[in-house]
């Protein structure tokens, strides 16, 4: 087993842009073990990623929508129907029978439009200053980087099942690992 000193020295030679999002704790937890290789520390999309005021507002709005729907279930009378809408949007089809699930969805098109309108631009400007691998635990930064032609991009899947929105609009053209 390598000594801690040798391991630490080796880690100093490895560097990557490490990006997360405040969409539940799972995304932050997934990148925490990578803090020692993160260039400029762990970047949180919409917070310390170089986003403009407009970009930060977009991320805040997304977080508010996510949290509102996630917590809606606890509201008497209307909570369950509101959560059902959210659950429908986040529906993950059964794996079997195996079939082609690459068709774009409403969420994929919405993400595509948001990225084209500037979502993740601050992050892209920041990571473009130094060509390092991008490792992210949230799909939006990975897909934005892929759309901008940035390489290499690695996306950590935090859940056992993933929604179609975690995959590029044209998955066969994507370079995300």
Each model region followed by its residue ranges:
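Short His-centered aromatic/hydrophobic patch
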Residues: 137-139
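Conserved N-terminal ligand/cofactor-binding loop architecture of enzyme catalytic domains
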Residues: 32-125
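Nucleotide-activated donor-dependent transferases that construct or modify glycoconjugates
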Residues: 12-21, 46-48
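Active-site-proximal region of nucleotide-activated glycan assembly enzymes
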Residues: 148-177
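Short, well-ordered alpha-helical microsegments
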Residues: 26-28, 141-144, 162-164
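Glycosyltransferases and closely related glycan-assembly transferases
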Residues: 38, 121-133, 142-154
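Positively charged, low-complexity intrinsically disordered leader regions
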Residues: 1-13, 54, 67
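A short, glycine/small-residue-rich beta-strand->loop->alpha-helix junction that serves as a flexible
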Residues: 20-32
């Amino acid at each position: 087993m390598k000594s801690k000193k040798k391991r630490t020295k080796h880690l100093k030679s490895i560097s990557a842009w490490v990006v997360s999002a405040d969409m539940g704790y799972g995304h932050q937890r997934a990148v925490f073990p990578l803090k020692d290789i993160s260039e400029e520390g762990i970047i949180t999309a919409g917070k310390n990623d170089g986003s403009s005021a407009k970009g930060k507002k977009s991320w805040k709005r997304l977080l508010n929508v996510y949290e509102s729907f996630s917590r809606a279930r606890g509201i008497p009378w209307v909570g369950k129907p509101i959560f059902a809408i959210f659950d429908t949007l986040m529906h993950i089809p059964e794996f079997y029978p195996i079939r082609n699930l690459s068709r774009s969805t409403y969420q994929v098109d919405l993400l595509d439009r948001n990225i084209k309108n500037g979502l993740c631009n601050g992050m892209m400007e920041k990571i473009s200053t130094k060509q390092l691998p991008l490792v992210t635990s949230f799909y939006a930064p990975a897909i934005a980087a892929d759309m901008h032609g940035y390489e290499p991009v690695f996306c950590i899947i935090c859940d056992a099942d993933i929604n179609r929105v975690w995959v590029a609009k044209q998955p066969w053209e994507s370079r995300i690992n």
